[in-house]
């Protein structure tokens, strides 16, 4: 079912992260309040915004910051903020459950309740994004939550590169697809991946006729060699460029590569639903022909 309010204003927060968790939560809250003041009802924060992107290095000390959703400082704070402002806030956090840790999102509804947790399905692993060292591949399956402002699906960063993520959430009835992100320049490659990154998600919007919201961080984050990280050195410049598309994949709001701030856009969910139905993309699917996708 679509949101019977027909239209909803959404926002993406773009921010730089620092060493202190409380400072990052404070900054994120200020941006959330700015977005709400502009009328936004669904507000997306970047991936793992409580900390710098620690996955640039392998350091066992970072396991200490993992927590359950109930214990997590950001989840607890934004549950209060969401209730106070009457907004929906997906919160990305480093989750601990028993002997496993996950890269997760807690979906907080406009009444402050936690509707559930999604755990990142696709976990990258290379010199600059060493996430397999920290995160177990998610076991929740893809999630779409019925919120006060529509049915919302969330994929986390690397999930956004896989069309299966978007299509599964579309089949589950998502009105919008949200992607909290931490991505930047790759020093070992003489390329700029930002346009490719954007086009990938614009394609998901167009192929499913569902709006997409992506929130990225900005700033350069350096890893200093030390005994705890086995003398690893790394540096990433996160290229921001957060954006919002309409249901056909057109950019309707975008941030630059380096500035902190909030972008907003009005989404007509009812019109998107009507357009989605008129195209027949889901009517004409042939799942019995897609067995290769499971191999």
Predicted ranges, named:
Residues 67-70, 80, 96-203, 278-279:
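Active-site catalytic loop in hydrolytic enzyme cores
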Residues 10, 24, 32-61, 82, ...:
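Active-site beta-strand/loop signature of hydrolases that rely on acidic residues for catalysis
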Residues 10, 107-115, 245-252:
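Short, glycine-anchored, charge-dense loop/turn motifs used at functional sites
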Residues 270-295:
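A conserved C-terminal secondary-structure "cap"
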Residues 58-71:
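A charged helix-plus-loop insertion that forms the helical arch/lid used to bind
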Residues 91-93, 104-107, 143, 242-244, ...:
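Short beta-strand scaffold segments in enzyme catalytic cores
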Residues 70-90, 157-261:
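CN hydrolase (nitrilase-like) catalytic-core segments centered on the catalytic cysteine
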């Amino acid at each position: 079912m679509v949101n019977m309010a027909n239209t909803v204003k959404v926002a993406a927060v773009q921010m730089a992260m620092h060493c202190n968790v409380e400072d990052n939560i404070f900054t994120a809250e200020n941006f959330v309040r700015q977005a709400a003041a502009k009328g936004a009802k669904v507000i997306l924060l970047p991936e793992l915004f409580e900390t710098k992107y620690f996955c640039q290095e392998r350091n066992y000390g970072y396991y200490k910051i993992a927590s359950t959703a109930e214990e997590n400082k950001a989840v607890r704070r934004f549950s209060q903020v969401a209730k106070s402002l009457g907004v929906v806030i997906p919160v990305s956090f480093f989750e601990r459950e028993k002997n496993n840790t996950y890269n997760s999102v807690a979906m907080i509804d406009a009444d402050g309740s936690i509707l559930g947790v999604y755990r990142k399905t696709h976990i990258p692993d290379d010199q600059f994004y060493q996430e397999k060292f920290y995160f177990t591949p998610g076991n929740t399956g893809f999630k779409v939550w019925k919120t006060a402002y529509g049915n919302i699906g969330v994929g986390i960063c690397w999930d956004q590169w896989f069309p299966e993520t978007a299509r599964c959430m579309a089949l589950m009835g998502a009105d919008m697809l949200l992607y909290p992100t931490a991505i930047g320049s790759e020093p070992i490659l003489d390329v700029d991946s930002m346009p490719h990154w954007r086009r990938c998600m614009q394609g998901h919007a167009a192929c499913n006729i569902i709006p997409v919201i992506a929130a990225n961080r900005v700033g350069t984050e350096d890893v200093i060699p030390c005994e705890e990280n086995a003398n690893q050195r790394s540096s990433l410049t996160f290229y921001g460029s957060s954006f919002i598309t309409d249901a056909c994949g057109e950019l309707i709001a975008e941030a630059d590569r380096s500035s902190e701030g909030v972008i907003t856009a009005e989404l007509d969910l009812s019109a998107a639903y009507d357009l989605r139905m008129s195209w027949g993309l889901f009517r004409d699917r042939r799942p019995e022909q897609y067995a290769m996708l499971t191999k």
